[in-house]
Amino acid sequence: MSKRDYYEVLGVARTAGEGELKSAFRKLAMAYHPDRNPGDKEAEIKFKEVNEAYQTLSDGQKRAAYDRFGHAAFSQGAGGPGGPGFGADFGDFMSDIFDTFFGDARAGGAAGARGGRAGGRERGADLRYNLEITLEEAFTGKTETIRLPTSVTCEVCAGSGAKAGSKPRTCPTCGGYGRVRAAQGFFAIERTCPNCHGRGEIIDDPCTACGGAGRVTRERTLSVNVPAGVDDGLRIRLAGEGESGLRGGPAGDLYIFLSIKPHPFFQRDGADLFCRVPISMVTAALSGEITVPVIDGSHTTVRIPAGTQTNKQFRLKGKGMPVLRSRDVGDLYIQVFVETPQNLTKRQRELLQEFDQHGSQADNHPESAGFFSRVKEFFDGLSGSGRA
């Protein structure tokens, strides 16, 4: 069965802390526990999946490896990180969970087998690879060569895990099901078979090349086509490029998760780009031209009209990002802000003071004049109301 992303399984963000992981695990383990869902195979699978995800993400080293390589970091053997059984921390939660099950408890009998046979064909796990690209690369598209470790079928034993001339035998403990059920007080607990570790079969004479796992780890090189117009967080699926299946099962898929590096000039909103550009006080007052960058590496000229104010926006049509799988292209918006001069010389100060003395407040600064006029009217109105 294909493995989902562990963070997705627990329903938490990749930045989730220990407390958030523990809370999510507790909630899901209670929801999918077999004693609350008797005979529900889907709940049984999810219960096992939740436990495996928590055992990985609650361990610092395993979590770091998983964040970098996904399921490929633990590709030796079936069942994921730490094996398919229950980890030590799981027992700490079970007492709390069992308290909530008391009303639904079912008296258990002797150990017994349950579930489908584990020894059949099994699809390989899906893999995740995080790829970071620049905004320019998202604009043009690119072909990226990646290298990743992954599990492939052992060529020596053809995936059986057994040495040439021998073959696995059915596990006598679980009868080939891979799981056993045992009574514990009022509760019946299902767990991975301790004898075959969930495989449903025993390999008496394991293959020397893979140690009985049926798969070996190899580093593969793949070419990934990143189309123009991709956005941050986009997922690219490469079918059949995940881990090899077990016992003749199909391979899983490889998912490329894209992230785009922050750009020093441009901010992106869909297919549109935004760029803040400083202009001088003189250019803003008298008009002029400025040269601005474009995402394709070129430059273009923007005409600044006289009297331009801070945050004035100019639209450059068709200078933004391409729309993914479309001929449409976004726009580039240039937002200017007027830079107040600093470290003025004596003569510059005199010129500015002369300008201020010879100008009309209403003509030169209509916004300021209008604002202070409205303030005066407001307070005059308050004074008139007080006298009345």
Swiss-Prot record:
Cofactors (names): Zn(2+)
Zn-finger region bounds: CR-type: 141-219
Any one Gene Ontology molecular-function term assigned to this protein's record: heat shock protein binding
Entries under PROSITE patterns matching the protein: DNAJ_1 (PS00636), DNAJ_2 (PS50076), ZF_CR (PS51188)
Keyword terms of this UniProt record: Chaperone, Cytoplasm, DNA replication, Metal-binding, Repeat, Stress response, Zinc, Zinc-finger
Chain ranges passing through the membrane: none
Gene Ontology biological process: chaperone cofactor-dependent protein refolding; DNA replication; protein refolding; response to heat
One cellular component (GO) term of this entry: cytoplasm
Gene3D superfamilies attached to this UniProt entry: DnaJ domain, Heat shock protein DnaJ, cysteine-rich domain, Urease metallochaperone UreE, N-terminal domain
Note on how the cofactor is bound: Binds 2 Zn(2+) ions per monomer.
Annotated Zn(2+) 2 binding sites: 171, 174, 193, 196
Localization per Swiss-Prot or TrEMBL: Cytoplasm
Statement: the UniProt record of this protein carries the keyword Glycosyltransferase: no
Keyword Transit peptide: no
Binding site for Zn(2+) 1: 154, 157, 207, 210
Repeat (CXXCXGXG motif) residue spans along the chain: 154-161, 171-178, 193-200, 207-214
Domain of life of the native organism: Bacteria
Chief location: cytoplasm
Record InterPro entries: DnaJ, DnaJ_C, DnaJ_domain, DnaJ_domain_CS, HSP40/DnaJ_pept-bd, HSP_DnaJ_Cys-rich_dom, HSP_DnaJ_Cys-rich_dom_sf, J_dom_sf
Domain J, chain residue ranges per copy: 5-70
Protein function: Participates actively in the response to hyperosmotic and heat shock by preventing the aggregation of stress-denatured proteins and by disaggregating proteins, also in an autonomous, DnaK-independent fashion. Unfolded proteins bind initially to DnaJ; upon interaction with the DnaJ-bound protein, DnaK hydrolyzes its bound ATP, resulting in the formation of a stable complex. GrpE releases ADP from DnaK; ATP binding to DnaK triggers the release of the substrate protein, thus completing the reaction cycle.
PANTHER family cross-referenced by the UniProt entry: CHAPERONE PROTEIN DNAJ, DNAJ HOMOLOG 1, MITOCHONDRIAL-RELATED
Family under the similarity heading: Belongs to the DnaJ family.
HAMAP family in the record: DnaJ (MF_01152)
Domain notes: The J domain is necessary and sufficient to stimulate DnaK ATPase activity. Zinc center 1 plays an important role in the autonomous, DnaK-independent chaperone activity of DnaJ. Zinc center 2 is essential for interaction with DnaK and for DnaJ activity.
Protein name: Chaperone protein DnaJ
Source organism (scientific name): Methylobacterium nodulans (strain LMG 21967 / CNCM I-2342 / ORS 2060)
